[in-house]
Structures are given as structure tokens and as C-alpha cells.
């Protein structure tokens, strides 16, 4: 009955967002609110409290945790419009510290992955958004789409000493390409942390080539 009433008073887009939010709050990734990354979260929780600006590729449970447990300003990009709207609604009390951007990379399949290259020219909007803001993150979580490109882009634009935490890194060898530029700093379960070195230690021309090469690699 409630759903029928909602459909009568809200436009289709708002109704869709509300329905998505209901499912969002039931999602297993929002259960156990103090546990992140299936428990591999001690490194993240230790380092996030040291920074005043946090960047995130892909939004959700970690976004909410940071807003509720730190004073950091949060800059986030995601490929799902419904997911972005749900996160906004779910974090209304902290929206003054949340800058969240929906990057339209086309129709999506599972986990926000584009199902085609129809909007290939928009892929850079996703990888670059965080670094187009006035303030740069001091900690970046790579946990969404285009992960290698996001990492390399962060390496290019981040200040020396910035921490980059790469989720699902340890057991996915295809991500290990990034060690061409920087060595592992710390590990925590499935995650690996890197620290951005001085730009003088990076071949920036080669880095730009690799960013272009990985721009269209969605995973």
C-alpha cells in the first residue's frame, strides 16, 4: 500500500531512487556498520583519522563510516546514479562534508561496470573528477571501476606523501602493474597501501602513456 501511495505522489525518478534506497539499506554491505572490506579494515581505519580530505573511487559503506567517524571532507565519484542518490540521502546529516559525483559512463551491469564502450569519451570524467577539486585528498581509496587507471591518475596528480589504498589488490595480479611506479608500503588482508613519491622519481611521460593505455580497462 505504501509503495502504491509513493508512486502516486512522487515522479518516476524519485520513486526509483526511493525504491533503490530501501534495497540499499538492506544490502549486506551496509550491515555490520563498523566492519569494512570484509574485516580487512584496520589499516584504513588507522590512516583515515590522520587526514582532512579523503577521496574515494566508488561509494557506499566506507563513505558513511568516514563521515560518521572522522571530520574529513569526502570527495567521491561513482558510476551509478541510483547509488549516488542513495548515499546522499543516507548521509544527509553530513552532506556539508560530502562532495559526491555521478559519472555517466553509460548503461551499467553488475557492480557499476559499463556494459559497452558507447560513452568511452566520458571514462576520464570518472578517473579525473577527484583531482579537479580545489582541495586534494591526502588518502585515496581505489575501490570502483577503472582501478589501474584511477591509481595511475592519483599517482600523477596527488601530492607527495599522499596515501593510496588499493582494495582487492593482493589476490588480483592484474593490478600489480602499478608497482612499475611505486613499491608496496603496507598490506592489510586483501588491501595494499602505497605512498606517492616525489614526482622527480616518476617518469611522467611514461606514466601518461600508461594512463591512456588503461583508460578503457573497466576492472
Listing of model-derived features with the role each one plays in the protein:
Residues 38-110:
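SAM cofactor-binding core of SAM-dependent methyltransferases
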Residues 36, 57-58, 145-148:
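Short, glycine/acidic-rich beta->alpha junctions
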Residues 101-153:
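Internal catalytic-core helix/loop-beta-alpha segment
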Residues 130-134, 138-219:
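C-terminal substrate-binding/active-site "lid" region of AdoMet-derived donor-dependent transferases
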Residues 38-44, 61-63, 124-130, 150-153, ...:
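A generic local structural motif
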Residues 20-36, 45-51, 107-129:
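Glycine-rich phosphate-binding "P-loop"
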Residues 1-35, 209-219:
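Membrane-proximal basic amphipathic "stem/tether" segments
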Amino acid at each position: 500500500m505504501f509503495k502504491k501511495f509513493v508512486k502516486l505522489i512522487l515522479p518516476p525518478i524519485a520513486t526509483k531512487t526511493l525504491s533503490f534506497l530501501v534495497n540499499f539499506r538492506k544490502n549486506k554491505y551496509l550491515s555490520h556498520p563498523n566492519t569494512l572490506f570484509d574485516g580487512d579494515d584496520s589499516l584504513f581505519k588507522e590512516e583515515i583519522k590522520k587526514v582532512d580530505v579523503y577521496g574515494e573511487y566508488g561509494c557506499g559503506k566506507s563513505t558513511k563510516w568516514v563521515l560518521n567517524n572522522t571530520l574529513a571532507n569526502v570527495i567521491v565519484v561513482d558510476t551509478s546514479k541510483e547509488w549516488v542518490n542513495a548515499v546522499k540521502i543516507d548521509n544527509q546529516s553530513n552532506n556539508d562534508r560530502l562532495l559526491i559525483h555521478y559519472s555517466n559512463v553509460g548503461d551499467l551491469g553488475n557492480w557499476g561496470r559499463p556494459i559497452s564502450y558507447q560513452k568511452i569519451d566520458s571514462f576520464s570524467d570518472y578517473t579525473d573528477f577527484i583531482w579537479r577539486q580545489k582541495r586534494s585528498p591526502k588518502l585515496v581509496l581505489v575501490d570502483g571501476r577503472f582501478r589501474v587507471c584511477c591509481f595511475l591518475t592519483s599517482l600523477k596528480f596527488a601530492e607527495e606523501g599522499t596515501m593510496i589504498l588499493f582494495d582487492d589488490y593482493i589476490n588480483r595480479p592484474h593490478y600489480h602493474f602499478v608497482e612499475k611506479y611505486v613499491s608496496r608500503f603496507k598490506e592489510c588482508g586483501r588491501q595494499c597501501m602505497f605512498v606517492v613519491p616525489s614526482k622527480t622519481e616518476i617518469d611522467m611521460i611514461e606514466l601518461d602513456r600508461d594512463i591512456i593505455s588503461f583508460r578503457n580497462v573497466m576492472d
